[in-house]
Amino acid sequence: MVAYLNIHTAYDLLNSSLKIEDAVRLAVSENVDALAITDTNVLYGFPKFYDACIANNIKPIFGMTIYVTNGLNTVETVVLAKNNDGLKDLYQLSSEIKMNSMENVSFELLQQFSSNLIIIFKNVADEHRDIVQVFDSHEDTYLDHQSVLVQGIKHVWIQNVCYQTRQDADTISALAAIRDNAKLDLIHDQEDFGAHFLTEKEIKQLDINQEYLTQVDVIAQKCNAELKYHQSLLPQYQTPNDESAKKYLWRVLVTQLKKLELNYDVYLERLKYEYKVITNMGFEDYFLIVSDLIHYAKTNDVMVGPGRGSSAGSLVSYLLGITTIDPIKFNLLFERFLNPERVTMPDIDIDFEDTRRERVIQYVQEKYGELHVSGIVTFGHLLARAVARDVGRIMGFDEVTLNEISSLIPHKLGITLDEAYQIDDFKKFVHRNHRHERWFSICKKLEGLPRHTSTHAAGIIINDHPLYEYAPLTKGDTGLLTQWTMTEAERIGLLKIDFLGLRNLSIIHQILIQVKKDLGINIDIEKIPFDDQKVFELLSQGDTTGIFQLESDGVRSVLKKLKPEHFEDIVAVTSLYRPGPMEEIPTYITRRHDPSKVQYLHPHLEPILKNTYGVIIYQEQIMQIASTFANFSYGEADILRRAMSKKNRAVLESERQHFIEGAKQNGYHEDISKQIFDLILKFADYGFPRAHAVSYSKIAYIMSFLKVHYPNYFYANILSNVIGSEKKTAQMIEEAKKQGITILPPNINESHWFYKPSQEGIYLSIGTIKGVGYQSVKVIVDERYQNGKFKDFFDFARRIPKRVKTRKLLEALILVGAFDAFGKTRSTLLQAIDQVLDGDLNIEQDGFLFDILTPKQMYEDKEELPDALISQYEKEYLGFYVSQHPVDKKFVAKQYLTIFKLSNAQNYKPILVQFDKVKQIRTKNGQNMAFVTLNDGIETLDGVIFPNQFKKYEELLSHNDLFIVSGKFDHRKQQRQLIINEIQTLATFEEQKLAFAKQIIIRNKSQIDMFEEMIKATKENANDVVLSFYDETIKQMTTLGYINQKDSMFNNFIQSFNPSDIRLI
């Protein structure tokens, strides 16, 4: 038997460039019979290695390279599993090494696991004899062919393999440089390490002792371990009084069913069916385990989502409290979740509020034991963009070149270097010089290799035995991880549950806590009305910022057109707004507003598709159609649905015949049967699981309900979740203002790190202030809790420690208004900073001694800072304006001129702004132009003034004034900007608008009677302007008459209206 006993795969991270599939391919081409995977200290690659070997008729041998020490010397050692007990020993040995961050293994530890292992010591020298001789009585101890002779121990030929061919030796140097954050020496780091996959011809050319080769065959024959997939490894649930899980589960379910006010007989029938399926499959422990951890969460102040995925289709899940979705009420199918005709582990994913998810994981660890619970490893790979930068960095490319590389590779998920090479600019870069070509060659060899490990975001493995009995473990950032990925661990048979952290649940929970604390209202989200018209009005207006699943611009647009009237509309929207089914949205909306346009291919489709107006939206509908027409069981229907989504032609043709035959036997004509099959085939590609849609729509509805009825609390918590994002915070602040919510400046006696809702409005977070860190906020808030609110600015300065009380902090707090409640102007407080920072006030002492030993602090009252300066400081320190910005204030007064904000302006429409910055530059042709920053009082935008316009408006730009600008919107470096075509002062624009208006549109006729004499029925001369009334209730414009612009009362007429009720066109 020809065997390689020392293969290091790419899962020996950054030590080998040999992919498992390449090792197996080479083995096949060189007639190798067996391969041993021997990565250093880890077993990451075992499942992939085993599958690849079995698929190619190669014998897989499981092993590991370790470094054995006696405290003085260390020897490289390969250990191979002889059997499945040896495989388990490898699991535990690797787990011990990785969990304890060992670099070397003591010979005593190796002895504990040696009985079912073959041990091969490598490169043994005289100083290693003491270690080796400890194992001389071990039946299967060997030395490699390069070791010294040790009496009684046989030698074996063993070839270290880390890369494919001699030409790939540079990959090892490159990987080492990436690992060590070093530079790659392209001249001296290109030695051949002698670790490539030897060809049959190369082996024959070696002068190898035949006895050594014989031992290779002996060892390969002795190694007969195999991975066991699909084991039954479900942990047993500890029931009270050791009652069987089956009996206990039934007792709990019936007890709960009796508590609910439901149609008992209907629900009992469904319950009996589900219970039978679950117990026949042996999953009763699974449901009890999941129910237990959710019960812990709910009784320990951790919010749990209503359901996720198809599990909401289970009545058992509903009765156990795993979900809060009644599957019968919402017409959900159990078989979509658990199919009795396709036995697979049920998959219940659980959403917890993200800030308290760890509590539940900790509970599971305490209940089952630390070694019985783990997270799951994932691997980061050297994909195109990452490998390009990594190799560029180790080759000494400067930052400019590295950025050029990044810009040349498109931001496309899964893009390869070969795909990037098809782009001309990237190809030119590669062939710019020999160094770049060498860079590309190394990148290509390393592309796709695993680079590092990380933790799966949600998966938790649970077992009632130590997990290392079934899979190797390693240490992650926050606990243990399996060394195998999620799919590999599940394939072994281990129970995996996804504990997902959902930010929106944290927001909901915080709102409920605060409303109860502040208002004394205990909101039970399971009892809120799901037909609240105010909620549907909110959704119909597209006012869904901060609403789970509904806040994208596209969904808002759909909601405005659809105008939801009931919960099912929300379920439909969340299901339709995805690639594929989006094309059905116009049909759905049209039919929803005019049911007469609904058409069915066959009348028997109506009961199934009535709620979705004839449009197939849900996977469950496909299953129901198959059941109705072809008499499929729901289990068979689920298999059909899966086959359709996978597009396997052979399977699809078989299912087509199955469906048509079933339909014929059920009394349907063959033609209609084929049409129905084609219909569901079309939608199967993107049908959405209704159970998941209902569950997530429930979260969306709850958030909408809270937004409608407790807006201050809603926005405060949404804002608290975007701390750190200046752009999102500014957007949310602006929306809250539009909703009539008062945004209060940070208040030193009220504010926290998070935003604080109150009945008056929302206090800004102290943490929002630039230059004020979390620790400073914590000190301030802790002092306030311990010793009461601050009496004034001087009291604050005395009580806050010197290490926190810096000029920078005090200025920031003053300039955003944190001390405004003390009744002193911000300029007065700025003047007082020197007093509080002098020597006496920096002495931290108790208040009594301070009052005696220090002179009374006095304010020197100053006039308040100008509004423009206050706004400027707020923008500087907060990223947005709290007080009304002068531009925004002027906009409110002058909106009758039909002017726009940056956010809603279109090309060439007049926009009121100030210029925050004007940067003049000279073009290559020697002409002047400018880049400017426009500010409309709410947001800022970059603008460009090209030479012709700059020459025209250069003098205007030197004025500190408010301007009306217009131009064309464009994108530069993926950022929106305005190419400015025209600039006027506001005063000039207003004068011209009044002089040349063609029409006046009013929205309120209450002032008309006062000016009745001015209004003429017909146009008499060129100075007459049309006066129109726009009735918003019926969306209709009517002409009231004409007004002469030259009339002395014309301006009085204009000014008599609220600026929001009149427009000059």
Swiss-Prot record:
A GO BP entry: DNA replication
CDD domains per record: DnaE_OBF (cd04485), PHP_PolIIIA (cd07431)
GO cellular component: cytoplasm
UniProt KW keywords: Cytoplasm, DNA replication, DNA-directed DNA polymerase, Nucleotidyltransferase, Transferase
Main location: cytoplasm
GO molecular function, one term: DNA-directed DNA polymerase activity
SUPFAM superfamilies: PHP domain-like
InterPro entries, sorted: DNA_pol3_alpha_NTPase_dom (IPR011708), DNA_pol3_alpha_thumb_dom (IPR041931), DNA_pol3_finger (IPR040982), DnaE2/DnaE/PolC (IPR004805), DNAPol_HHH (IPR029460), NA-bd_OB_tRNA (IPR004365), PHP_dom (IPR004013), Pol/His_phosphatase_N (IPR003141)
Record-listed E.C. numbers: 2.7.7.7
Recorded catalytic activity of this chain's protein: DNA(n) + a 2'-deoxyribonucleoside 5'-triphosphate = DNA(n+1) + diphosphate
Places the protein is found: Cytoplasm
NCBIfam families (UniProt xref): polc (TIGR00594)
Purpose of the protein: DNA polymerase III is a complex, multichain enzyme responsible for most of the replicative synthesis in bacteria. This DNA polymerase also exhibits 3' to 5' exonuclease activity. The alpha chain is the DNA polymerase.
Assembly and interaction partners: DNA polymerase III contains a core (composed of alpha, epsilon and theta chains) that associates with a tau subunit. This core dimerizes to form the PolIII' complex. PolIII' associates with the gamma complex (composed of gamma, delta, delta', psi and chi chains) and with the beta chain to form the complete DNA polymerase III complex.
Family of this protein: Belongs to the DNA polymerase type-C family. DnaE subfamily.
Protein name as catalogued: DNA polymerase III subunit alpha
Annotated gene: dnaE
